Structure formats: C-alpha cells, structure tokens
Amino acid sequence: MKRVWLCGLAFVISACTPPLAPAAKADPDIPQWKTSNSMGCMMVRACKDDTKLITSRKDLGSGYDKYAYELNTIFAATNKIGIKVYLAGDKYFTPKTRGLYNVKGNNLFISEDIIDNPEMVMGVIRHEGWHAVQDCMAGSVTNGMSALVWTKGEVPSIVWDGVIADYADTPQAIPYEAEARWAAYSNYKTADGLVACANPRVKIWEEYPPIPSTKQWLIKQGYIR
C-alpha cells in the first residue's frame, strides 16, 4: 500500500487542455519555478494562478474528436467521483513532467505546454487517471492511499523495464507507475476503471478482483470481510 503526496509524474507521454475557471488572486512567493516546490504549491491549491478547471472534452479545444467517447466517459466519471481536472501553466512542472495526480486532494493536473498535442494529452489523462483508479482501489478516494490493481504479469515486461529505469531512485513507486504507464498506452483501461470507481452500487474491487496485497489491505481496513 502506498501513501503519497504526489502520486504519479507522467513523463514524455502526457498532456492536457484549456477552458474555464477564473485565475486565483495572490499566490505564495515561489523562489524558483519548475521545481518540486512549485509543483507542490499547485497540487495543494495554494498556487492557483494560471490554472483552469476542465470538466468536459470541449474544454480541451479542437483535435480531440478521435478520443470523444473515451474522454466523455472519463470526464463523466471524474465529475461524478469529485476528481477535479486542471490545465496548469508549464511554470509549475519540473522538467519532463507533464501531469500529476494528488491522491490527498483528488486533483489531476495537466501541463498547458502540451495542449496542442492530443496524443500526449490523452496519455497524460490516462496515466494520471489510472492513479485515481489506484486511489479508489485502496478503499476510498478520501483516505489518501493508493493500491495496486493488476498483478505484475498483467503489465508487459517492456513497460516494466522502462519504468524500472525511470524510477530507479524511488523503487517503491515502480509497480504503481508501471500500471499507470500501461494504462496510458491502452484505450479505455482508465475510462473503465474510473467508471467502476464512480459506480455507487458496486465497489471497484468487485469489478477488479483485488490482488493478494490489496485484498489484505481492504480486509485490514474493514472494506471487505
């Protein structure tokens, strides 16, 4: 089980979109942008300048028609769950970071720097959206925890190899990032997971039978018997 403040840094395969939501007023002084400090300020919503709430595919602008059904499904689910998706200024993100999901605040952020690249934006939404699925799989999106959904064998070895190389300094994140990266490459996996999370009648672990470590956690916390 993983408790994280920042859950998921989507690298080269990520991106998102513009739209509505007024800019915030005075933000805290940030001594240096494009750092973990500026990302953290954005994630906890202490910094709101140059961030826009997006609630539908239309907020992303043109070029997303080929992903219409998948995006409509994702936004319908995130809106129902209460996950807020923001398009944010590139100044907040560390180099190579294109998206973030905050497991404690249930906020998903996409760098506006990639908005004109629908393929990259879709990768980011799928990747960070899968971290929201992991959040849900830990029992509730309100408990600040994440749980694995798939067994190691369900993620292709080539994906594992890339994630192991990228996250050598944070090995505890590797299985979570491997799942998210595989979801980013896959049509509808994130959409399906978020739909399961948003279903008020059926728990997500009834749709996705939990792997042993996740099942143990759910039993220990009283989510299942």
Region spans (language model):
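Metalloprotease/metallohydrolase-associated module, dominated by Zn2+-dependent proteases
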Residues: 145-225
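Catalytic Zn2+-binding segment of zinc metalloproteases
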Residues: 129-146
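Auxiliary, metal-adjacent structural segments of Zn-dependent hydrolase domains
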Residues: 22-23, 37-104
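Stable alpha-helical elements in mature extracytoplasmic
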Residues: 67-74, 121, 125-129, 176-179, ...
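C-terminal motif of bacterial Sec signal peptides marking the signal peptidase cleavage site
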Residues: 14-15
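Short, low-complexity, disordered segments immediately C-terminal to signal peptides
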Residues: 20-31
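Sec-dependent signal peptide recognition
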Residues: 2-8
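Short pre-active-site segment immediately N-terminal to the catalytic Zn-binding motif
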Residues: 108-125
